[in-house]
Swiss-Prot record:
Keyword Membrane attached: yes
Name the UniProt record assigns to this protein: Uncharacterized MFS-type transporter YcnB
InterPro entries referenced in this protein's UniProt entry, alphabetically: EmrB-like (IPR004638), MFS (IPR011701), MFS_dom (IPR020846), MFS_trans_sf (IPR036259)
Keywords, alphabetical: Cell membrane, Membrane, Transmembrane, Transmembrane helix, Transport
Main location: membrane
One GO CC term on file: plasma membrane
Domain of life where this protein originates: Bacteria
GO molecular function, one term: transmembrane transporter activity
Subcellular location(s) per record: Cell membrane
Pfam families: MFS_1
Membrane topology, record value: Multi-pass membrane protein
Gene: ycnB
Position of the signal peptide: none
Family statement drawn from the similarity comment of this UniProt entry: Belongs to the major facilitator superfamily. EmrB family.
Amino acid sequence: MNTSIEQKPFNRSVIVGILLAGAFVAILNQTLLITALPHIMRDFNVDANQAQWLTTSFMLTNGILIPITAFLIEKFTSRALLITAMSIFTAGTVVGAFAPNFPVLLTARIIQAAGAGIMMPLMQTVFLTIFPIEKRGQAMGMVGLVISFAPAIGPTLSGWAVEAFSWRSLFYIILPFAVIDLILASILMKNVTTLRKTQIDILSVILSTFGFGGLLYGFSSVGSYGWSSSTVLISLLVGVIALLLFITRQMKLKKPMLEFRVFTFGVFSLTTLLGTLVFALLIGTETILPLYTQNVRDVTAFDTGLMLLPGAVVMGFMSPIIGRIFDRVGGRGLAIAGFCIIFLTSLPFMQLTDHTSLAWIVVLYTVRLLGTAMIMMPVTTAGINALPRHLIPHGTAMNNTIRQVGGSIGTALLVSVMSNQAAHAGTTNVKHAALHGMNAAFIVAAVIALVGFLLSFTLKKPQRPAEQQPAR
């Protein structure tokens, strides 16, 4: 049953601007501390494994909270939810800026992630609500700009700020933007979503936390501990069991926290798979290439960030344009072309040497991210368009959750292939062994891209737009 909430006339451009700005600063924080970790380790006297939790905890909190956002979006108004999310994020930023020790800084990151985890599904749901179906590609293209550009400039901005000032400046830089967006949201944001009478199921929250949290932590730990590690195996086992129990419970509940029946829509299921494949390739590539430039070519972390920046700029710039193309031609052709580009750029990456032109690598990576932009938001939009309006919050939450898991799986798979092949390279030269492993990892990436390419041919437009789908 819907809850009647007064929806006053709203300025769509204002809402879009507020949400994009809030999401940008929130998503930027995912990668903002990467190059600052050595400085934090020195100041707080912690080792690399402890410091890594500043990024791992952010990812885990996001992965745990995102599945709950479908319930939150149905329970609370879009205005209240945005203000709450930005308030939580801003509070975490303040705590981080003045953290006296490492535990407080880690707590600040978790608080930041709690706010950021709400932002992405909320932004997608609001955009899909306020834009007509024939303009959703354009809307999601703007989302693509944020999720591609924001995390990419994180390491570059971090490298500059830490060298010029201190790691605390990263929080000082973010804070005014977060405060301004919070003030604007309080004044200008309107309610645009429809509320429903729903109650939180505590057991579902617990199972979701252990399910998705276990999988994310398990897969993200493979690179550090290996597949045979008890940490990895126990985390994955707990995650799988909890997730199966979670799915079973959701199917039995009259009003589930996360509606798995979105997968009864074939187009949504296929596009979610395609989106997961391309995100796994994206995160996996962004993990392998810095290892190549820094460990094999002795390029600094800051310069590596600069090398990856053109690809992020192209991906961000092209996302809105590709969104408009999607509105005209649909997602099938874009996905086919995108996976083809990723496959073709994987071939040269399979033949990296210790003297491969760095400029050539920048060109390949930039073209590769153009292909990624042709897939990521178009297939997401195509899948959401197949859902009836009342399932859109569940579709966006499901899509973002599975993307997080897919990214961790992609990284785990490629890093484990790289490590295994490097260990059996038959050479005592460490750099040559690493190269052998990296080339093998890109062979796997090429196979994944080929699978995505073939699956893209089966993508069809939904028979009826979401507004015309019968309620279930």
